[in-house]
């Protein structure tokens, strides 16, 4: 079988690291990276996705595109998401149509469903919420409820991808992945976000006379309620790098989908997102479950 030629936009962020760590160098793929800045270790087509003419040559000869490039700040305002997330996504679709690239994996986000979490947290993070007989779970047919302009821009992205899959000829296979809590290798575990908060507190130097409110800087002590709530959230929402890479591989191997939505989340017992649809359609079988961890990496994990 010949290699698949795969273009990755925005490959050097948290989600992209899963590709670099778990897929780059695999004999099945020949990757091209498109990013607005260069990287010392990887050959990169340097261009801003808001500039169609600059990105267009990178799409020639590709079999698939993994579109990760975006303004990923969940708190971004409207002006912050228009060019990278709306214009940029349209440009990627236009370039795929013009270069006749058949397959797109679109990096959507759990923030498309963010108000569900806002309305139900922190109880949502319990394995037995709302009861031991009726687990709260969102699937691909649940109505989007974004929690900000970033999430709304991803709703737009999902819908314009659907339009192109149905109307424009290429791409004619689109996988919208609502990605949940992928982290860099250093924090690729359910305690990662909580430990980052501890580190932020350790790094902060309190100036003379300063009244420092840790909560305003996203920092906390390891034995605090904030730490535990962050652990609870990640035990529900964590997506390990290897599970995310596996889901990408499932999409790249599939030839049945015209357009569909899947949740990129590990097999966490407390997850509030469905993975059964991805299992049934794509053969996704996550290897990780956050409930197996009862401490950060220097602690213990049930399967180690």
PLM region spans:
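N-terminal Rossmann NAD(P)H-binding glycine-rich loop of SDR-like oxidoreductase domains
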Residues: 4-27
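NAD(P)H-binding glycine-rich loop region in Rossmannoid oxidoreductase-like domains
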Residues: 39, 47-87
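Active-site Tyr-X1-5-Lys
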Residues: 131-174
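Alpha-helical substrate-binding/gating segment
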Residues: 182-184, 190, 194-229, 238-259, ...
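Amphipathic terminal alpha-helices
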Residues: 290-304
């Amino acid at each position: 079988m010949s290699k698949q030629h795969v273009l990755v936009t925005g490959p050097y962020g948290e989600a992209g690291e899963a590709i670099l760590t778990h897929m780059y160098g695999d004999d099945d793929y020949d990757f091209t990276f498109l990013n607005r800045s260069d990287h010392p270790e990887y050959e990169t087509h340097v261009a801003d996705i808001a500039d169609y003419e600059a990105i267009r040559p990178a799409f020639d000869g590709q079999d698939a595109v993994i579109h990760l490039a975006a303004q990923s700040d969940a708190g971004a305002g409207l002006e912050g998401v228009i060019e990278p997330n709306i214009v940029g996504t349209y440009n990627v679709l236009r370039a795929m149509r013009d270069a006749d690239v058949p397959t797109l994996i679109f990096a959507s986000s759990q923030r498309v469903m963010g108000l569900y979490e806002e309305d139900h947290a922190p109880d949502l993070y319990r394995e037995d919420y709302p009861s031991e007989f009726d687990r709260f779970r969102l699937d691909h047919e649940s109505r989007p409820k974004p929690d900000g302009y970033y999430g709304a821009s991803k709703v737009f992205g999902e819908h314009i991808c659907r339009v192109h899959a149905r109307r424009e000829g290429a791409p004619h296979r689109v996988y919208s992945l609502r990605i949940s809590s992928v982290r860099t290798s250093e924090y690729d575990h359910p305690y990662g976000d909580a430990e980052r908060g501890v580190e932020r507190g350790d790094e902060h130097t309190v100036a003379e006379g300063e009244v420092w409110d840790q909560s305003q800087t996203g920092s906390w002590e390891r034995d605090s309620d904030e730490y535990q709530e962050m652990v609870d959230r990640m035990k529900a929402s964590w997506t390990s790098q290897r599970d995310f890479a596996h889901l990408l591989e499932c999409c790249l191997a599939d030839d049945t989908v015209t357009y569909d939505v899947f949740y990129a989340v590990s097999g966490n017992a407390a997850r509030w997102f469905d993975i059964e649809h991805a299992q049934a359609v794509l053969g996704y079988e996550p290897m990780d479950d956050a409930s197996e961890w009862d401490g950060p990496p220097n602690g213990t994990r049930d399967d180690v």
